[in-house]
Amino acid sequence: MQMTTPVDCAPALPGPLPRRHSRAAEIRWGERLVRVGGDAPVCVQSMTNTDTADAIGTAIQVKELARTGSELVRITVNTPEAAAAVPAIREQLDRMGIDVPLVGDFHYNGHKLLQDHPACAEALSKYRINPGNVGQGAKRDTQFAQMIETACRYGKPVRIGVNWGSLDQDLLARIMDENAQRAAPWDARAVMIEALITSAIESARKAEEIGLPGSQIILSCKVSAVQDLIAVYRELARRCDYALHLGLTEAGMGSKGIVASTAALSVLLQEGIGDTIRISLTPEPGAPREKEVIVAQEILQTMGLRNFTPMVIACPGCGRTTSTVFQELAARIQSYLREQMPVWKTQYPGVEDMNVAVMGCIVNGPGESKHANIGISLPGTGESPAAPVFVDGVKVKTLRGERIAEDFQVIVDEYVRTHYGAAQAKATAAE
């Protein structure tokens, strides 16, 4: 057997590249402040799919998204009825104790809606403007300016969100004409990327000329192809220091949408690009809207960028694990942990860092369980019908019988109270 040559230097330490420096935007509602950019952690946001004119239905969905962990929630403002409902939505949320900032999503007629409904303009914490459909020709500059002036008047930050499906056609024609003059013209993909970036940066600079501080501007350039999104944001990050909103538009449904969004965003986040993310999933019929929030959180948490909820480590199963017990227990514990987080995150600071291992056999079960804060190694096929439990690397007991799931959940609860509750009590006593 050939021996490998020893190396003198240690392996490179894992981790993302340093975050790209950007100006920090501040999005407020009441006492709630969400910073996007600067040294703030990457922010998770989402969008409702209700009819905004239905104030009660929209407020209920915003509440669910916020309780799941969305730090900003965007709502469509597309009609006078929707604009008129925004103050009622905000009021209803405030009554429910939900202070998540609301972002108004405007297309085509945003300038008029904000002008005709000042209460809407005030109730929103941020505006999203699409420079591709704010108006055509001379009207474009006037209507864009009207929206920016409203943002300045009420002190609201703005996301200038460019989308390849609604790109400013006049600008695209200009970029194509410039490309035709090159000795070696770019291909169509490069022209499209250049048009997206140019639209975003030129619009941002115009907004600054009107009076909106650059620190209150967030940019996005969304496309639906993974490699195009990566290329667009790499170049956009190189050319400006505005905060950046990441998202793969029209990512799709189910596993395809999750995989595509993860493939694109994880590359950019690993390179230090991105200040806020939204996962644009097409929901399955009847599926909860909160799925997009959970996916966004799991991307950030699995990359080690932020922690939101205790994570369950579980093996995939194999011929040694013909029983479904460990699968059912893993799903049950993960659901339980997420359900508890709205209460735990205030009562037990740091609990979001906890790892729980639910393993299916003796091969990796005990070892993986020892590395977690709490771990259980369930018996595989042909193994003794016993499940050793490990706490902080030490075997504390062995569970048997029909109530393994219930008994393990009690151990998890006790660990949270004794470890994270003690830390909270100590911090309170020190104040």
UniProtKB/Swiss-Prot annotation:
- What are the protein's GO molecular function terms? 4 iron, 4 sulfur cluster binding; 4-hydroxy-3-methylbut-2-en-1-yl diphosphate synthase activity (ferredoxin); 4-hydroxy-3-methylbut-2-enyl-diphosphate synthase activity (flavodoxin); iron ion binding
- Give EC number(s), comma-separated: 1.17.7.3
EC primary class: oxidoreductase
Superkingdom per UniProt: Bacteria
- Necessary cofactors: [4Fe-4S] cluster
Q: Which pathway does the database say it acts in?
A: Isoprenoid biosynthesis; isopentenyl diphosphate biosynthesis via DXP pathway; isopentenyl diphosphate from 1-deoxy-D-xylulose 5-phosphate: step 5/6
GO biological process assignments = isopentenyl diphosphate biosynthetic process, methylerythritol 4-phosphate pathway; terpenoid biosynthetic process
Q: Which reaction does it catalyse?
A: (2E)-4-hydroxy-3-methylbut-2-enyl diphosphate + oxidized [flavodoxin] + H2O + 2 H(+) = 2-C-methyl-D-erythritol 2,4-cyclic diphosphate + reduced [flavodoxin]
Q: Which InterPro entries match?
A: Dihydropteroate_synth-like_sf, IspG_bac, IspG_bac-typ, NO2/SO3_Rdtase_4Fe4S_sf
**What keywords sit in the KW lines?**
4Fe-4S, Iron, Iron-sulfur, Isoprene biosynthesis, Metal-binding, Oxidoreductase
Per UniProt, where does [4Fe-4S] cluster bind? C315, C318, C361, E368
Annotated cofactor note? Binds 1 [4Fe-4S] cluster.
Q: A Pfam family in this protein?
A: GcpE
Q: What does this protein do?
A: Converts 2C-methyl-D-erythritol 2,4-cyclodiphosphate (ME-2,4cPP) into 1-hydroxy-2-methyl-2-(E)-butenyl 4-diphosphate.
Q: Fetch the HAMAP family from UniProt.
A: IspG
Family of this protein: Belongs to the IspG family.
Name recorded for this polypeptide: 4-hydroxy-3-methylbut-2-en-1-yl diphosphate synthase (flavodoxin)
Q: Which species?
A: Ralstonia nicotianae (strain ATCC BAA-1114 / GMI1000)
Gene designation: ispG
